């Protein structure tokens, strides 16, 4: 099988040296992502496209899906590469490929040609289109808005029969821009802002301020791992967790009620800037949107920015909530955000929307900054790829089984789309489907006399969810890894 990768248009208008660098980086990213599916896979770069050739036909859908999620790709063409002799040979091959697809439909033919030939692209379009129209009685030519567009590419003595076109996410290849550190909470805003910077070519690391214990951190880990695995797995990234409960306690004790929200955000920026400096990261990313909450007015945002020289990027600054939720739905983080445990460690009864710098600084003089330094020093930093291994250690009390007993039921916790694409069928045991994002609200409705064996394809999500359910008091859960 063969795929032709078309570049994001902004790459094609770069200077020659920059364009070549971007293409080289994108080629490496594609190799890094796809090597998990087929080790014999070949990735070949050209000036205006990248070829992906693979032998394992069983991995076709997985490879195609992975390509649509790699930043830098505008669209993917799934093609059949065959030799041809003349224009009539092109027609015959097109007829064999498209006959069933064109029956009862309107169509047009579009041809791209490279190399020296005795015919032009328009001549091929007319010849092939006329032939298809004659040989398929129920088909009809329609040059504008047809039901089916027959795409053909002619390159020297090769014909590319385009079997399908699939849109990519566009943007720049990860690694073409510098690293950023996303302040992730697991909600709608921070997950979307992280995605937007990945799509723009940045390697996104994650910094999480834990205000609510292990369950909260587990939820945020799931979101960060999902974003990385889905859009950024070509690169290694860090997940840094900072226990911010001591900082919150100090703020509650020492800071005036109305100033708490701004002071908390300033402390988070200070801490994140220290982490960024430690790892050579150039900018912070937040999901703040103008006017969404009291701390996100222009006055307050300016005061928050003042505590650090590190650049703070806010890709959602002009977005409304509905737009952000729609983007979260598109990238697959909406369900995470809706079920994320929320912890409001600092709740002001009358938060200021126009903080005064002198007042904020006066309140912060009462704060013991050694507490902030200590929590940053003790921050837990892991390679995001190790989240699965670390989770396995943390859920050592949750048994992992490869078989099942008479009272066991397998619980498939994959997303609905994954379940539809690859339904799980195991002989000798019942299989129940309940997507991971519904476990927190729906698991209690299941038959608690049964032992539930949580299963997902890679085992990461099942272990995380098993730990979460254990913390909620459910002892009848195990992890199923056949």
UniProtKB/Swiss-Prot annotation:
Entry's localization field: Cytoplasm
S-S bonds: 344-456
Pfam family name, one: THUMP
Active site, per annotation: 456 (cysteine persulfide intermediate)
Binding-site list for ATP: 183-184, 265, 287, 296
EC number: 2.8.1.4
SUPFAM superfamilies xrefs: Adenine nucleotide alpha hydrolases-like (SSF52402), Rhodanese/Cell cycle control phosphatase (SSF52821), THUMP domain-like (SSF143437)
Statement: the UniProt record of this protein carries the keyword Nucleotide-binding: yes
GO CC annotations on file: cytosol
GO molecular function: ATP binding; CCA tRNA nucleotidyltransferase activity; tRNA binding; tRNA-uracil-4 sulfurtransferase activity
Catalysed reactions listed for this entry: [ThiI sulfur-carrier protein]-S-sulfanyl-L-cysteine + a uridine in tRNA + 2 reduced [2Fe-2S]-[ferredoxin] + ATP + H(+) = [ThiI sulfur-carrier protein]-L-cysteine + a 4-thiouridine in tRNA + 2 oxidized [2Fe-2S]-[ferredoxin] + AMP + diphosphate; [ThiS sulfur-carrier protein]-C-terminal Gly-Gly-AMP + S-sulfanyl-L-cysteinyl-[cysteine desulfurase] + AH2 = [ThiS sulfur-carrier protein]-C-terminal-Gly-aminoethanethioate + L-cysteinyl-[cysteine desulfurase] + A + AMP + 2 H(+)
Pathway the protein contributes to: Cofactor biosynthesis; thiamine diphosphate biosynthesis
Domain Rhodanese: 404-482
Entry-linked CDD domains: PPase_ThiI (cd01712), RHOD (cd00158), THUMP_ThiI (cd11716)
InterPro entries referenced in this protein's UniProt entry, alphabetically: Rhodanese-like_dom, Rhodanese-like_dom_sf, Rossmann-like_a/b/a_fold, ThiI_AANH, ThiI_fer, ThiI_N, THII_Thiazole_biosynth_dom, THUMP_dom
Any one biological process term the GO annotation gives: thiamine diphosphate biosynthetic process
Keywords tagged on the record: ATP-binding, Cytoplasm, Disulfide bond, Nucleotide-binding, Redox-active center, RNA-binding, Thiamine biosynthesis, Transferase, tRNA-binding
Classification via NCBIfam families: ThiI_C_thiazole, tRNA uracil 4-sulfurtransferase ThiI
Record-stated family: Belongs to the ThiI family.
Protein's name in the database: tRNA sulfurtransferase
């Amino acid at each position: 099988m063969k795929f032709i990768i078309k570049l994001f248009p902004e790459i094609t208008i770069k200077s020659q040296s920059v364009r070549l660098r971007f293409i080289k980086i994108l080629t490496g990213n594609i190799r890094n992502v796809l090597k998990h599916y087929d080790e014999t896979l070949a990735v070949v770069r050209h000036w205006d496209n990248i070829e992906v050739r693979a032998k394992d036909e069983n991995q076709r859908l997985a490879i195609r899906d992975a390509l649509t999620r790699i930043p830098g790709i505008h669209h993917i063409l799934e093609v059949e590469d065959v030799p041809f002799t003349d224009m009539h040979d092109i027609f015959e091959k097109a007829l064999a490929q498209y006959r069933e697809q064109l029956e009862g439909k309107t169509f047009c033919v579009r041809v791209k040609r490279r190399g020296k030939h005795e015919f032009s692209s328009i001549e091929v379009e007319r010849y092939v289109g006329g032939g298809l129209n004659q040989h398929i009685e129920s088909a009809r030519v329609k040059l504008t808005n047809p039901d089916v567009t027959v795409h053909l590419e002619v390159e020297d003595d090769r014909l590319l029969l385009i079997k399908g076109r699939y849109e990519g996410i566009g943007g720049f290849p990860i690694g073409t821009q510098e690293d950023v550190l996303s302040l992730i909470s697991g909600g709608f805003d921070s997950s979307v802002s992280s995605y937007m910077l990945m799509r723009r070519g940045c390697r996104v690391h994650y910094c999480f301020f834990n205000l609510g214990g292990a369950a909260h951190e587990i939820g945020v880990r799931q979101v960060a791992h999902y974003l990385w695995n889905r859009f950024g797995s070509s690169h290694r990234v860090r997940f840094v967790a900072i226990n911010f409960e001591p900082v919150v306690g100090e703020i509650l004790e020492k800071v005036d009620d109305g100033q708490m929200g701004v002071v908390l955000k300033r402390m988070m920026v200070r801490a994140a800037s220290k982490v960024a400096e430690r790892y050579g990261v150039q900018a912070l990313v937040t999901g703040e949107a103008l006017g969404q909450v009291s701390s996100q007015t222009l006055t307050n945002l300016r005061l928050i920015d003042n505590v650090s020289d590190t650049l703070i990027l806010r890709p959602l600054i002009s977005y409304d909530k509905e737009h952000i939720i729609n983007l979260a739905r598109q990238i697959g983080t909406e369900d995470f955000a809706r079920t994320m445990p929320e912890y409001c460690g600092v709740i002001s009864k009358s938060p200021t929307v126009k903080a005064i710098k002198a007042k904020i600084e006066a309140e912060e003089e009462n704060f013991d900054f050694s507490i902030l330094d200590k929590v940053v020093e003790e921050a837990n930093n892991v390679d995001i790829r190790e989240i699965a291994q670390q989770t396995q250690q943390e859920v050592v009390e949750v048994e992992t089984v490869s078989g099942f007993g008479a009272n066991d039921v397998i619980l498939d916790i994959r997303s609905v789309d994954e379940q539809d694409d690859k339904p799980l069928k195991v002989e000798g045991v019942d299989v129940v489907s309940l997507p991971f994002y519904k476990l927190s609200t729906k698991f209690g409705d299941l038959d608690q006399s049964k032992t539930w064996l949580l299963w997902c394809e890679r085992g990461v999500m099942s272990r995380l969810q098993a730990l979460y359910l254990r913390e909620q008091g459910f002892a009848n859960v195990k992890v199923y890894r056949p």
